[in-house]
Amino acid sequence: MEAPIVLLLLLWLALAPTPGSASSEAPPLVNEDVKRTVDLSSHLAKVTAEVVLAHPGGGSTARASSFVLALEPELESRLAHLGVQVKGEDEEDNNLEVRETKMKGKSGRFFTVKLPVALDPGSKISIVVETVYTHVLHPYPTQITQSEKQFVVFEGNHYFYSPYPTKTQTMRVRLASRNVESHTKLGNPSRSEDILDYGPFKDIPAYSQDTFKVHYENNSPFLTITSMTRVIEVSHWGNIAVEENVDLKHTGAVLKGPFSRYDYQRQPDSGISSIRSFKTILPAAAQDVYYRDEIGNVSTSHLLILDDSVEMEIRPRFGLFGGWKTHYIVGYNLPSYEYLYNLGDQYALKMRFVDHVFDEQVIDSLTVKIILPEGAKNIQVDSPYDISRAPDELHYTYLDTFGRPVIVAYKKNLVEQHIQDIVVHYTFNKVLMLQEPLLVVAAFYILFFTVIIYVRLDFSITKDPAAEARMKVACITEQVLTLVNKRLGLYRHFDETVNRYKQSRDISTLNSGKKSLETEHKAVTSEIAVLQSRLKTEGSDLCDRVSEMQKLDAQVKELVLKSAVEAERLVAGKLKKDTYIENEKLSSGKRQELVTKIDHILDAL
């Protein structure tokens, strides 16, 4: 009985394909030519590889419908984006399908890329592999003073890490500056300005690794969004409200030693690696834009409306140095007809999962909450890439009864390539739109009924005149603070006009700036004088402090105008440059002292 079983087993093993046969293995492929470009000019590492992939055949007649892409073990954990395209074709809808896979006994991450057309033996295809890595440029030294420049270290691979052999390869490294402390010398690389060229390297075996290291100056903004919550609230009454809560951190070299605001404002190269401001691109239809932090509205931001977008310059209250953090909120409204589509009771919301915050952005952790109208059902989400979903929540706001459904999604390690649309499908019964108007009618009915009863009752209310007086004084003081800050801003703007005049020597620019300063300064000073009179009427002792501040401001204005006169004399050749610089230094010191006194008075107010 056992003999026939043994014979059948031996026959099955003889007929089964061996592990090395063509039926059990994918066709062998070869990287005929690889051109790598490693862009290290920002705080991201962008690696682009142009690969000529060949199917040499080698006795195999099988067609290759896909190939395997590998990432180095040292960089795999910091991968933010991976895209593969066929070279020479339009970018739209040209991304090849990529799925992560595993290779037994090999380290690193591996992906299977599906080819648009299967490769026959002897044929080739040119592809472009784009990868973006975050937090792989490490500051060295890790701490610098305000006046020092920032240097970083990057470690990678000289070779194109691949499961296939490579016949020839070159690598070009683009740095942020020409100031290079050191770099590896494999193959005697050439250097031109901020470019390092390695190779060509010949006949590179599969899975080859050789450490590439470069230590160079990089003062680009190392700005990272450590946490961001994006809330999208949809209303069927024509509006979509968007609000973004952003936690920012400068992840470059940590500031060592004291910080001098005077040097920071006076010297352009002071804190060269710090972040003074950045630009956020909002949708073209954005309206009612606001920007605030824990203190309140930040008035130093600027909004520029363009044809295809709204550009917002965000300037934090203080410059960001290495290790420093800040938090702010940006919100705006959008018309729903541009993003919300419907067919009967079927609705589709198409919006960006994450939008532009700043150039070369890095988001460590993103939470997106999409608040749908009350009564939305059968919710489905189509995302352009993998996202993590949390259980749906309920959100209650005005006139809600059983709550609005909230979609909660998460993703980590995002870059600009993740700025893509997400589509949310749901059903909504339009009859439910009558719910809120009926609730409003009922609320007004109850209100009027309550008022009718209230006016027929007699209540005696005792007022507190002292409390009302304090509230009036506080309101007037707040207006004075706003106007004083506005007046100081006029001086800063005029300083910029004087600097432009010294460069262009256009006297009309200076005269126009003087006229604008006089007009606006007179208007603001008059408003402060009116508020000072109101404080005096209220019997507040703050009136004297405002009067003192007015006197100090007159001295500041005198110094500002004197500085403009000195600039005219300098441009006209009536004043030597050394004398001008010395006078300007003395004037700046006096002016800074006066501004400090004004700040102390403002703090007292």
Curated annotation (Swiss-Prot):
It comes from the Eukaryota. Residues 1-22 form the signal peptide. Glycans are attached at residue 297. Its main location: endoplasmic reticulum. Expressed in all tissues tested. Subunit of the oligosaccharyl transferase (OST) complex that catalyzes the initial transfer of a defined glycan (Glc(3)Man(9)GlcNAc(2) in eukaryotes) from the lipid carrier dolichol-pyrophosphate to an asparagine residue within an Asn-X-Ser/Thr consensus motif in nascent polypeptide chains, the first step in protein N-glycosylation. N-glycosylation occurs cotranslationally and the complex associates with the Sec61 complex at the channel-forming translocon complex that mediates protein translocation across the endoplasmic reticulum (ER). All subunits are required for a maximal enzyme activity. PANTHER family: DOLICHYL-DIPHOSPHOOLIGOSACCHARIDE--PROTEIN GLYCOSYLTRANSFERASE SUBUNIT 1, RIBOPHORIN I. Component of the oligosaccharyltransferase (OST) complex. OST exists in two different complex forms which contain common core subunits RPN1, RPN2, OST48, OST4, DAD1 and TMEM258, either STT3A or STT3B as catalytic subunits, and form-specific accessory subunits. STT3A complex assembly occurs through the formation of 3 subcomplexes. Subcomplex 1 contains RPN1 and TMEM258, subcomplex 2 contains the STT3A-specific subunits STT3A, DC2/OSTC, and KCP2 as well as the core subunit OST4, and subcomplex 3 contains RPN2, DAD1, and OST48. This is Dolichyl-diphosphooligosaccharide--protein glycosyltransferase subunit 1. It comes from Rattus norvegicus. The gene is Rpn1.
